[in-house]
Amino acid sequence: MSQGQAIAIFGDQMATELLEVTSDIKRIDQGGWWAVTQTFEGNFAAYRFAHVQPLDDASLRELQNSQGLVQDSGIPVASWKSSMTAELYRHAVNTIRQDIARGWVYQANLCRILAAPLNADLDVIGLWRLLRANNPAPYLSALLVPAADAGLESDVRIVSASPELF
């Protein structure tokens, strides 16, 4: 099920009006604003957008009104599962701090997996808004490309809560 128009939100920029979808990496050298994806298997896709604007509250309200989006993702908080308990996470952080103090490492990335059952019609931008309100990662992003807009078999739906630049 497709939701609204194609949109890409990366950091403090919002892009709309999908112009092109390609799997040819050379196309991005020809200019424009592109959202680029690559799967773990190495499949590349790029989505070129016509309109890019700063992300602000007014543009978010306009987007919500134009797409009929809800305020949240519709995923009950209790349904989220973590690969680590809070106690295990704190222990891992303390272990890393000790290893840094000993000089054994100078940087470590502690990761955990959060998972929840998702409906096929998940409001991607609603999930992005929920993450933005509760986990303000500096490079929070979302990409929604309805299949009908891009000639694809299925929608592209990506939400990332990355603390690091892409």
Locate the predicted segments by residue.
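Extended alpha-helical targeting/anchoring segments
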Residues: 1-166
